[in-house]
Amino acid sequence: MLTDTLNTTKSEEIFAAAQKLMPGGVSSPVRAFKSVGGQPIVFDRVKGAHVWDVDGNQYIDYVGTWGPAICGHAHPEVLTALKEALDKGTSFGAPCLLENVLAEMVIDAVPSVEVVRFVNSGTEACMSVLRLMRAFTGREKVIKFEGCYHGHADMFLVKAGSGVATLGLPDSPGVPKSVTGNTLTAPYNDLQSVQALFSQHPDQIAGVILEPVVGNAGFIPPDAGFLEGLREITKENGALLVFDEVMTGFRISYGGAQEKFGITPDLTTLGKVIGGGLPVGAYGGRRDIMSMVAPAGPMYQAGTLSGNPLAMTAGIKTLELLRRSGTYDQLDRVTGKLISGLLQIAREAGHEVCGGHINGMFGMFFAPGPVHSYDDAKAADAAKFAKFHRGMLEQGVYLAPSQFEAGFTSLAHTDADIDQTLEAAKVVLANI
């Protein structure tokens, strides 16, 4: 039997105080547990594959700060590098050698990137790349996909995923129609709809931006031929193809989704992993396109803390760790064991589920599946997911508090962690 015995008294007290200080008591909406019920747990510390809350409860973590913690939380080599960097200062507001080092690592790894610009978040990266798409092509319209999330900038809050989907918001108040009027949307994995948009708006579309593997509407991989088709359509129409690899970059392979699937876009956005747990973002691509960016060209973009030495240091050390032999084989093995076990246990308990993984990224829907699109994801049983989430929390497993978020493993997850997670799932899934 499931019992609600988790002691979260201190978390509740802190969250109650936070609600008087911050909108909804959080700094980012999905953290509020709105879609799964109950109140959020407040973290005290993290280490490896585990997190501890302020009440002393320990959890196996499959959120990983929403993706960055691919090597595990508080990796000793990353911490050592950061401590050394701290002695030199936290921010320069000027060029530093560390930018060159991380830039070279990114350029060497990501097939599309010949030149890169560092920023402070994935949202910044996507805002900047949209401006660059328009500046380079001289066109204003952009195609995005339903359920794909590219940050909270006005022009992207159209049929967006992540927190927008989690809270059930149609889009967002405060976004003028004049801003979103040039944002066209298509169902993910639907090439016909993309071709139709190009036919309806000839010579007006600057490009197509997408999560090559969707992680902000749950885990939704591309159908066979989808990415290839987008590459062909954009080339035929003189438009740019942009992969938003803020989530997939350095996670599903060292060179991201574009390396994994063998499709090279014109531009790429990055974040999460390349900051090693510190705030970071980046965008890059073909040299002729990136030459438009100031001060090399006329398209303006800037940032006070961009390229700061701490984020660069953490990113460099994280990528060094990921380059070691067997890294992605380990992620694939551990994640495969996790998701195959969850699916089997759920089905044996009588639940209709579907899901999958690519290396360190995974997802499961309470739906017969397969899930190809945002509409498919929305048809999954959200109420059952909420019960599953709470039950797993009671059993010491921390999952993303939304069915519209992918899960993540790290190099710190062990077979014992996976076994414990699956044992917890047996208890929970037998009782919901």
UniProtKB/Swiss-Prot annotation:
Pathway: Porphyrin-containing compound metabolism; protoporphyrin-IX biosynthesis; 5-aminolevulinate from L-glutamyl-tRNA(Glu): step 2/2; Porphyrin-containing compound metabolism; chlorophyll biosynthesis. It is found in: Cytoplasm. The modification N6-(pyridoxal phosphate)lysine is found at residue 272. Pfam families: Aminotran_3. GO terms for biological process: chlorophyll biosynthetic process; protoporphyrinogen IX biosynthetic process. GO terms for molecular function: glutamate-1-semialdehyde 2,1-aminomutase activity; pyridoxal phosphate binding; transaminase activity. Its EC number is 5.4.3.8. GO terms for cellular component: cytoplasm. Its main location: cytoplasm. Its cofactor is pyridoxal 5'-phosphate. CDD domains: OAT_like. Homodimer. This is Glutamate-1-semialdehyde 2,1-aminomutase. The lineage of its organism: Bacteria, Bacillati, Cyanobacteriota, Cyanophyceae, Acaryochloridales.
